[in-house]
């Protein structure tokens, strides 16, 4: 298995890092992003660990989400590739979730 990060997921990580750099500290921002990436790596051992995402079911890809603090790591599995589609802040409206 391998991980693949979609462009929207990579953009979201940059947004998260930028926000926390300004509103917390650069060190906290890096620690948060590193933690999210580390949690995503755990999917390589247990790709079905996350819960199904009903909001994205209409896409037919079997999206799942894994909780990481106040964030959800949104992904789907396609063969041997785990596609990370979003790092979603749960304080946002669910319709902003990227799949």
Q: Can you say where each PLM-predicted feature lies in the sequence?
A:
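Short, hydrophobic secondary-structure boundary micro-motifs
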Residues: 29, 51-55, 96
């Amino acid at each position: 298995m391998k991980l693949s990060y979609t462009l929207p997921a990579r953009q979201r990580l940059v947004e998260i890092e930028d926000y926390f750099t300004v509103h917390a500290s650069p060190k906290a921002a890096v620690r948060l992003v590193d933690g999210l990436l580390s949690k995503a790596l755990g999917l390589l051992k247990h790709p079905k660990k996350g819960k199904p995402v009903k909001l994205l079911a209409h896409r037919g890809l079997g999206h799942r989400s894994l909780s990481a603090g106040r964030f959800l790591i949104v992904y789907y599995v396609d063969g041997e590739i785990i596609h990370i589609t979003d790092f979603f802040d749960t304080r946002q409206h669910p319709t902003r979730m990227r799949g």
